Curated annotation (Swiss-Prot):
This is Ras-related protein Rab-18-B. One of its GO terms (biological process) is eye development. GO terms for cellular component: apical plasma membrane; cis-Golgi network membrane; endomembrane system; endoplasmic reticulum membrane; Golgi apparatus; lipid droplet. It is found in: Endoplasmic reticulum membrane; Golgi apparatus, cis-Golgi network membrane; Lipid droplet; Apical cell membrane. A lipid is attached at C202 (S-geranylgeranyl cysteine).
């Protein structure tokens, strides 16, 4: 048992097939990138422990297939999640326009109203961009989401996306339970919020 782990959090990664959900997960957990990575079949699952403001949190990260034929997995996949990363491909506009569908699904199946949402525009290393950064930012603002652009290939923004999501979860009262007995939590409402490792890229809007 990890006695010094503050809490275990369930994080989901959702979005259309081919947007790079699995690549973002593997870059974050294993620091690897495979350009020939096959599409996820069903659900993949990885665990990683990170430190946020002196507190260690264990992340149980669920990566699901974007294809319609796997939608029967949906209810159990969403149950109990505290955070969700919603991914689109900045080079494919249709993956951006379908974000509303994913948000509707999230609202239908998620068991928490206060879960933290992060919008990630992936594949910014490519030249053929179809979705402007300001469009992503505007969408995130509309739906009260954190926002960042990233590249699983080059690492840009990946670590920040997960760290900022977890930090926001830990700052949300009642969203998580402490695994440490009688130790208290080293998070203070009086402390100024740090800008984050992304240097202003990532913001709650």
């Amino acid at each position: 048992m990890d006695d010094d782990v503050l809490t275990t959090l369930k994080i989901l990664i959702i979005g259309e097939s081919g947007v790079g959900k699995s690549s973002l997960l593997l870059r974050f957990t294993d620091d690897t990138f495979d350009p020939e990575l096959a599409a996820t079949i069903g659900v993949d699952f990885k665990v990683k422990t990170i430190a946020i403001d002196g507190n260690r949190a264990k992340l149980a990260i669920w990566d699901t297939a974007g294809q319609e034929r796997f939608r029967t997995l949906t209810p159990s996949y969403y149950r109990g999640a505290q955070g969700v990363i919603l991914v689109y491909d900045v080079t494919k506009r249709d993956t951006f326009t379908k974000l509303e569908n994913w948000l509707n699904e999230l609202e239908t199946y998620c068991t928490r109203n206060d879960l933290v949402k992060m919008l990630v525009g992936n594949k910014i290393d490519k030249d053929n961009r179809e979705v402007d950064r300001n469009e992503g930012l505007k969408f995130a603002r509309k739906h009260s989401m954190l926002f960042i652009e990233a590249s699983a290939k080059t690492r840009d923004g990946v670590q920040c996306a997960f760290e900022e999501l977890v930090e926001k979860i830990l700052q949300t009262p009642g969203l998580w339970e402490s695994s440490i007995q009688n130790h208290g939590v080293q998070l203070s409402d009086n402390e100024p919020q740090r800008q984050g490792a992304c240097g202003g890229y990532c913001s709650l809007v």
